Structure formats: structure tokens, C-alpha cells
């Protein structure tokens, strides 16, 4: 009897599973990432999401890293629910010498966004990872290191490979100039990063309010 019970216990603990062939497939209904119409922004989320914001950011900006640390999870959550679309507008004004740190990171973001099947939540996680591991005024991550972060964030293998190869996806000089001009238009008094702009109300967001994201989402 003990042997029978032991066998039953083992069966209950292990259970029966049906082998699944192949790899997990992305949700066809999940929000994706794309390059904005003007060519210099990166939009993560549905085009018809009820809340639309722009975030002006510099890859070496420590305050931008603080922003991602504080609300990165929240941004990913609302993007995944289809309630929020975030358009990132990278800038490179902290680049010095020939290192091209901010330009390299910005280009990698455009590589990811230009891939038709890049999941928006994975893109947001990629952004968080890049800003969480900064090297201000240093060399910054190389293409292989950036590609590793892209893979860990869940971006497609094609994106990871293109980043690792150093594929060019945007003219970062033109990108920086265009996004600076746009930042000046939305907030001529403070042309710094991070700046969050509410596209629904045409107003800058007070990101020093600890509950700004929740308030923004509840107002939609």
C-alpha cells in the first residue's frame, strides 16, 4: 500500500505535460514600437492609446536615469495595457570628443523601433536597461553590450543582431538638432532633459510630482 501511495504522490507531484515544439510566439495583439512620422522619435504603444506623451531624454543624463528608475515599471505597465503611448526623443548634447556614447545608444533605439515586430513593452524595458547602466562622460556600452541588453529586454533576435553589427538607423546629428528644436517649442524656458510633454493637452508634465504618472493616467 505504501508503494502505491508513494507512486501516486510522485505522479501528482510530477504530473503529465504535453511537449511543446518551437519557441514562444509574440502576442499578435500586443502594442508594438515604431519610428515617429517625423523620423526622430520612437513610439512605444498603440497609435490610438488614450494617453500620449513625449519624453525628451539624453542617454548620459543622470536625471533621465532617475526618471526611468522611478516610473519605468509604470510606463511599461500602462503601455502593455494599451492605455499609454510614449514617444522617446533622444538627444546627444552630452557627447564629448569622439566617443559617441549618446549617439550610439540613440542609434540602437532607432534600430529597435524600425523593426516591425518590436514589442512596445520590451522596448520600454530596453530603455530602462540602457539608462540604468550609465557611464557619464565615459565610453559607454559598445554595440555588443547594447545588443545584449536588447536581448535581455525581450526584443527580437533580428534587432539584437542588427545592433551588434552596428547598423545605422538614423542620422544622430540631424536627430539631435530636430529634437532640440522641438523641445524648445514645447518648453522654451527649460530645454533640458528629461522633459515629459503631454500630447493630449499640449502641456509639459510636472515630473517632480511623485504621482505624476498615475494622475496623468487617471485624467484620461
What do these predicted ranges mean?
Residues 19-21, 25, 151-220:
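C-terminal cap of thioredoxin/glutaredoxin-like
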Residues 118-121, 144-151, 158-162:
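Surface-exposed, polar/charged faces of alpha-helical domains
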Amino acid at each position: 500500500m505504501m508503494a502505491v501511495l508513494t507512486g501516486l504522490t510522485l505522479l501528482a507531484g510530477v504530473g503529465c505535460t504535453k511537449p511543446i515544439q518551437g519557441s514562444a510566439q509574440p502576442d499578435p495583439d500586443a502594442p508594438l514600437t515604431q519610428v515617429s512620422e517625423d523620423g526622430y522619435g520612437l513610439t512605444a504603444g498603440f497609435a490610438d492609446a488614450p494617453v500620449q506623451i513625449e519624453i525628451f531624454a539624453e542617454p548620459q543624463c543622470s536625471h533621465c536615469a532617475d526618471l526611468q528608475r522611478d516610473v519605468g515599471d509604470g510606463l511599461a505597465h500602462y503601455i502593455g495595457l494599451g492605455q499609454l503611448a510614449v514617444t522617446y526623443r533622444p538627444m546627444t548634447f552630452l557627447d564629448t570628443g569622439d566617443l559617441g556614447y549618446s549617439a550610439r545608444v540613440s542609434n540602437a533605439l532607432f534600430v529597435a523601433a524600425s523593426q516591425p515586430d518590436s514589442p512596445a513593452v520590451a522596448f520600454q524595458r530596453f530603455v530602462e536597461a540602457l539608462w540604468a547602466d550609465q557611464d557619464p562622460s565615459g565610453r559607454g556600452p559598445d554595440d555588443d553590450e547594447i545588443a545584449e541588453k536588447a536581448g535581455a529586454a525581450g526584443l527580437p533576435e533580428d534587432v539584437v543582431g542588427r545592433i551588434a553589427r552596428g547598423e545605422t538607423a538614423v542620422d544622430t546629428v540631424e536627430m539631435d538638432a530636430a529634437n532640440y528644436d522641438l523641445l524648445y517649442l514645447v518648453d522654451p524656458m527649460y530645454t533640458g532633459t528629461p522633459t515629459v510633454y503631454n500630447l493630449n493637452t499640449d502641456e509639459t508634465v510636472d515630473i517632480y510630482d511623485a504621482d505624476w504618472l498615475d494622475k496623468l493616467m487617471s485624467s484620461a
